[in-house]
Amino acid sequence: MKKIEGEGASQFTTSELCEKIGLSKGDNLLLFSKGRAEKTLEKSPYIASAKLSAKLPHTMKITIKERKARGYVPYMGSYLYIDEEGRVLEVAGSCRDALPLVKGLKFDSFTEGEILPVQNTDALAVILEISQLMEKYELLDEVVEIDVSKPKDIYAYVNQVQIHLGNMTNGDMKIQYMQQIVKTIPKEDRGILDLSGLDNPKANVTFQYLT
């Protein structure tokens, strides 16, 4: 083996992946246990799937499908990084990227790499739906906080604007409106954007400025 290629990984360098599975140049391309290496890599919460393929005459390719953090859940002074399934990817003392802080989930414990075992599963279902819609409309790096303490009366926060979503009836429309309206509001402006009325086709969207 003279060359090792990596594809699909942003959380890990190719060198880090090789270190995890004990792969190095000079190894026998055909005798290296690819299946065992794939299982080892998939133990990482960030790696959804791994595939090693030998490319003759002397190249090994590591293809990774990663899980992505979609939000942070505060927990005892730390933050749980969760993906779009509610899986705990990492526990850290700070938030690295611009992703929403998720409030309102109730749980007593967790296991890294597993789905967060919340008591209020309806709230988790709501946050997963919202995060997918916010990814669709490229809002994940804009939203500061999402509060699902009351799954039928949801609030989100962008800059100094409180956004009242209400429930997730017409959720796609609400998040689309949110994306369109928020970008027109100057960051220094304070106010309340009420999208909850979109449950009713005849209702209006309102914005109340706060001083």
Language-model features: where?
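Short, surface-exposed ligand-recognition loops at beta-strand->loop->(often short) alpha-helix junctions
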Residues: 7-8, 27-32
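Aromatic-capped interface at the extracytoplasmic side
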Residues: 1-9
